[in-house]
């Protein structure tokens, strides 16, 4: 473990929660002046932190603990029948890792995805500045995994390569390709990639029991949740 005790953290003022509208949220951020070190990031991921743009953060709410960090221990992952079908359905896709960058091709796909899948969320309406600030960061451990079919871009999985696993930062995909279940496939592919690289886990961010948009995360078993500062398997 790195010497986390020397790091500084700052808490935001309470603000409206984007997942549970009736709640007020507070977020704990690593000091922005702290260099984005991959080993610090890995240690903080074990403590439930995530990356958004140039910031590492985790929920720090006074009256709510609904946001539970979730990860998949990839060595024990056992795909179910539906997941095997999804993997087989997308075997014709070509996957390529590239350095994060802005392009109109990426933004057009991101824009269609947000407008058709998340028009009720706080990322709507999408903008080029929002896309760049959120996802296009010059970090040596960050990748855009492109999923293409005969050159056509169908999905991008923004992923951080950490010493202890892959952190699934964000995935956006072609909303018209519903049959392919591209969001689910991107997670399955990242699990397989983590296995290939000999890594321990894929970090999925936060799971919220009463948030329907989060339900998909518990379809990957086994899944571990960070509860009382310990990773435990969800039964």
Swiss-Prot record:
Gene3D superfamilies: 3.40.630.30. It is found in: Cytoplasm. It is an enzyme of class 2 (transferase). SUPFAM superfamilies: Acyl-CoA N-acyltransferases (Nat). InterPro entries: Acyl_CoA_acyltransferase (IPR016181), Asp_Glu_LeuTrfase (IPR017138), N-end_Aminoacyl_Trfase (IPR030700), N-end_Aminoacyl_Trfase_C (IPR007472), N-end_Aminoacyl_Trfase_N (IPR007471). Coiled coil: none annotated. GO terms for cellular component: cytoplasm. One of its GO terms (biological process) is ubiquitin-dependent protein catabolic process via the N-end rule pathway. The keyword Cell inner membrane does not apply. Keywords: Acyltransferase, Cytoplasm, Transferase. It catalyses: N-terminal L-glutamyl-[protein] + L-leucyl-tRNA(Leu) = N-terminal L-leucyl-L-glutamyl-[protein] + tRNA(Leu) + H(+); N-terminal L-aspartyl-[protein] + L-leucyl-tRNA(Leu) = N-terminal L-leucyl-L-aspartyl-[protein] + tRNA(Leu) + H(+). Pfam families: ATE_C, ATE_N. Its EC number is 2.3.2.29. Its main location: cytoplasm. GO terms for molecular function: arginyl-tRNA--protein transferase activity; leucyl-tRNA--protein transferase activity. It comes from the Bacteria. Functions in the N-end rule pathway of protein degradation where it conjugates Leu from its aminoacyl-tRNA to the N-termini of proteins containing an N-terminal aspartate or glutamate. NCBIfam families: PRK01305.1-1, PRK01305.1-3, PRK01305.2-2, PRK01305.2-3. Belongs to the R-transferase family. Bpt subfamily. This is Aspartate/glutamate leucyltransferase. The gene is bpt.
């Amino acid at each position: 473990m790195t010497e986390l005790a020397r790091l500084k953290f700052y808490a935001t003022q309470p603000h409206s929660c984007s997942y549970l509208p009736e709640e007020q949220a507070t977020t704990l951020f690593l000091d922005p002046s702290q260099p984005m070190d991959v080993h610090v990031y890995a240690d903080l991921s074990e403590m439930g932190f995530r990356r958004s743009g140039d910031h590492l953060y985790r929920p720090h709410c006074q009256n709510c603990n609904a946001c539970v960090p979730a990860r998949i221990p990839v060595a024990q992952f056992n795909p179910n029948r539906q997941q095997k079908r999804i993997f087989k359905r997308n075997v014709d896709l070509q996957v390529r890792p590239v350095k994060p960058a802005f392009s109109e091709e990426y933004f057009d796909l991101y824009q269609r995805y947000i407008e058709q899948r998340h028009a009720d969320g706080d990322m709507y309406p999408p903008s080029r500045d929002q896309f760049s600030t959120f996802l296009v960061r010059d970090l040596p451990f960050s990748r855009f995994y492109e999923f293409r079919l005969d050159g056509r871009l169908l999905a991008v999985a923004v992923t951080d390569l950490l010493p202890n696993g892959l952190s699934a930062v964000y995935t956006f995909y072609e909303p018209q390709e519903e049959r392919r279940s591209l969001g689910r496939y991107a997670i399955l592919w990242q699990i397989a990639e983590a296995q290939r690289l000999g890594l321990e886990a894929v970090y999925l961010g936060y799971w919220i029991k009463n948030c329907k948009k989060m339900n998909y995360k518990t379809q990957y078993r086994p899944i571990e949740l960070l509860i009382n500062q310990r990773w435990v398997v969800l039964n």
